[in-house]
Design a protein with these regions (language model features):
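Catalytic cores of carbohydrate-active enzymes across secretory and cytosolic contexts
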Residues: 1-220
């Protein structure tokens, strides 16, 4: 994943200053970028990599037999892999999470509690692991129609655009029949737009539709 991604970026002519790796699956991106560099330049390259760990579950932390990796990588790649990706619990294993943490300047977990768990799980990196709670960017996540409706009732919400936390005041409108009706109308209009994008699926906006979209992984 990481190697192919880096080659694709190069083939497309992109010049990227900062690479953000989500999970260790993509950690080989650093190897691809570093394999032709001097030792000093390899260390400098770490400044351009950030890593986000999303889960403590084993499926999110790839481990491969060192012998198997040696068979598919050239000498320069494998030497870097051994240096930065050694598994602290098994000398015969390459650990892609360790590779990511050893080669990225910035490392973070996705919640305060997850940060605590990750620091315990990877104690050798304890002092470097920060926590950034997952969330949404309010002004791009809320549709234009709903945003306009919220603006209309902002006298109750209290300035939601400047302080999104004020959206909790929407509970003050739960018994407002006009607001509830307008919110439902906005929701239906958004649903029609979505159905038009998915017209080949023949989804009807007036039919209740349940969707399930997750990655294909055993623990999901």
């Amino acid at each position: 994943l990481g190697i192919g991604g880096m080659k694709a970026l190069e083939a497309l002519g992109y010049s990227i200053d900062m690479f953000h790796l989500n999970e260790g699956h993509a950690a080989l991106a650093f190897i691809e970028k570093a394999k032709k560099l001097s030792a000093a330049d390899v260390n400098s390259l770490k400044e351009h990599f950030a890593y986000t760990c999303h889960t403590p579950v084993a499926a999110g932390h790839d481990r491969f037999q060192k012998k198997a990796m040696q068979e598919i990588m050239n000498e320069a790649e494998f030497n870097l892999l051994k240096k930065f990706g050694a598994d602290p619990d098994n000398s015969d294993v390459i650990n892609l999470t360790q590779l990511a943490m050893n080669t990225c300047k910035f490392v973070n977990a996705v919640a305060k509690k997850h940060g605590e768990v990750t620091r315990a799980q990877f104690s050798q990196h304890r002092d470097r692991i920060q926590s950034i709670t997952n969330g949404v960017h309010t002004h791009t996540w809320i549709s234009d129609l709903v945003a306009a409706l919220l603006d209309k009732y902002d006298h109750t919400l209290g300035g939601w655009r400047k302080d999104p936390k004020r959206l909790k005041n929407i509970l003050l409108l739960k018994d407002n029949a006009s607001f509830r009706s307008e919110l439902w109308t906005a929701h239906q209009e958004n649903k029609k737009k979505l159905c038009s994008l998915l017209k080949s699926w023949r989804i009807q906006p007036d039919v209740f539709t349940v969707c399930w979209a997750r990655r294909i992984a055993a623990y999901k």
